[in-house]
């Protein structure tokens, strides 16, 4: 199979990736395990590509996946609006490769390999 199960059932895995994708859109940089980051990379690339398309169908597809969380409390902008108005225009000239994964040390406690995933 071409994906990682991350020790979860299908619904738990989808919920985890939705949460991580929403957090990455809001914060533009998160710290997580290497396996989660590699799975998240594929999801977030698709979301940014939808944002670049920018039509109504792309917006609805992204809205079905991204959680409805406030990205900026001062302006009241939510994660979906941030994706389509702030993040996607940045990558208009770039064909993929919107994220960077930088390795950190192992996590204290269980030794899981930790990384920082961020938008380029």
Curated annotation (Swiss-Prot):
Biological-process GO terms, alphabetical: translation
Disulphide bond pairs: none
Gene3D superfamilies tied to this protein: Ribosomal protein L17
Alphabetized UniProt keyword annotations: Ribonucleoprotein, Ribosomal protein
SUPFAM superfamilies the UniProt entry points to: Prokaryotic ribosomal protein L17
GO cellular component terms, A-Z: cytosolic large ribosomal subunit
Presence of keyword Ribosomal protein: yes
Transmembrane segments: none
Coiled-coil annotated residue ranges, if any: none
Pfam families: Ribosomal_L17 (PF01196)
Entry GO MF terms: structural constituent of ribosome
Subunit structure: Part of the 50S ribosomal subunit. Contacts protein L32.
Family recorded in the similarity comment: Belongs to the bacterial ribosomal protein bL17 family.
Name of the protein in its database record: Large ribosomal subunit protein bL17
Organism, as annotated: Geobacillus stearothermophilus (Bacillus stearothermophilus)
Gene: rplQ
């Amino acid at each position: 199979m071409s994906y990682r199960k991350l020790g979860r059932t299908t619904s738990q895995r989808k919920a985890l990736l939705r949460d991580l994708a929403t957090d990455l859109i809001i914060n533009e940089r998160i710290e997580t395990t290497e396996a989660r980051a590699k799975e998240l990379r594929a999801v977030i690339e698709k979301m940014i590509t939808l944002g670049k398309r920018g039509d109504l169908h792309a917006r609805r597809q992204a809205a079905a996946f991204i959680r409805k969380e406030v990205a900026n409390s001062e302006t009241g902008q939510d994660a979906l609006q941030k994706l389509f108005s702030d993040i996607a225009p940045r990558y208009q000239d770039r064909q993929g490769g919107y994220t960077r994964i930088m390795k950190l040390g192992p996590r204290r406690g269980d030794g899981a390999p930790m990384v920082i995933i961020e938008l380029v």
